[in-house]
Amino acid sequence: MEVSLLLMEQIAQLFIVLLMGYIVVKAKLLKPSDSKVLSVVFVYLIMPCVVLNAFQIDDTPEIRAGLLYSMAIAVGMHVVFLAFDTVIRRPLKLDVIERVNIIYSNAAALVIPLVQALLGSEYVVYSCAFVIVQLILLWTHASACLQGSTKLEWKKILINVNLLAIVAGALLYLLHISLPAPIVSTLSSVGNMIGPMGMLLAGMAIAEVPLKKVFCTLRNYLPVVLRLLVVPVIVLLLLRVVHAAGWISDGKAILMTVYLSAITPSCATVTSMAQLYNRDAAHSSALYVLSTLLSIFTMPLMIGLFEVLI
């Protein structure tokens, strides 16, 4: 349970930063709309720095095996998410906003700082596997669901700055190109802002939403419980059944990196996409807020179960 307790401590620290973001908006020092400026810094500057820095590692057979392993696990997890959605959406009468909030987690923004704290920066590269799979599905499956069509947003997939950063980082890794020390140091310094900046943005988003309505709307709890508890438990049981941790050396630590991505709250990008496609962005925002707040308790619980079962 040591890792679970450490995770709880790290989430508590991030929650304090979230409160800071909430307070600066409520104190009228910033407007909720100011978060859009910070979002640009987060998406187009901080995230690419984290990704590029993650791939500045030595090329060894163990790391290559770990990358292939984490990619296979990430693909498998998303297959489970999509299959689960197919099974439950009609019996539970889930609308499209609820469905995509259950399927897609906030892995990119939340997992990387947690992986850095729990396992070390050398494991961040494995979390990129989940992000790659999710980015592709966000702009294909999620986009099609929200548009109500099968039209694929290939241009948005291919020019997504984080996907481009992953491709660039992977090429540097495969070609054994090490960036100069000052550049690596700069990437690391900027990348270290990912946790605080992500939580500041979450706090500012929460300040914009009437919390009474979020917490008192009972329907909101259904997709949130499915995202934070039911889906993670199903994934965990499947990982145990197939003995996934034993597939490669250091499998448990790498598996935890990918599993952390699967147990995070609803994806913030879904709300932005809901606005883009004229869907119920307020409902999506409410699910994001509720799942983010409740994940403070559920994520340590799920990692505790992971330690016991895997």
What positions do the PLM features span?
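Alpha-helical transmembrane segments of multi-pass small-molecule/ion transporters
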Residues: M1-I310
